[in-house]
């Protein structure tokens, strides 16, 4: 696992996404997992460089 540094705005957006999922009946733990996985995928794709 690795750390992802998020801006305050990105953190707020993640919280909103978690709250939206919870409003749809998803548990808080599962909502956090879903959003965290999405953030890791985005971060992983951002780290790729043409040299790889």
Curated annotation (Swiss-Prot):
InterPro entries: UPF0181. Coiled coil: none annotated. It holds the Pfam family UPF0181. It comes from the Bacteria. Belongs to the UPF0181 family. NCBIfam families: PRK05114.1. This is UPF0181 protein NTHI1697.
């Amino acid at each position: 696992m690795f750390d992802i540094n998020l801006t305050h705005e990105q953190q707020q957006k993640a919280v909103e996404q978690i709250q939206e999922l919870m409003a749809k009946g998803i548990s808080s733990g599962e909502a956090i997992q879903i959003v965290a996985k999405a953030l890791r995928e985005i971060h992983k794709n951002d780290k790729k460089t043409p040299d790889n």
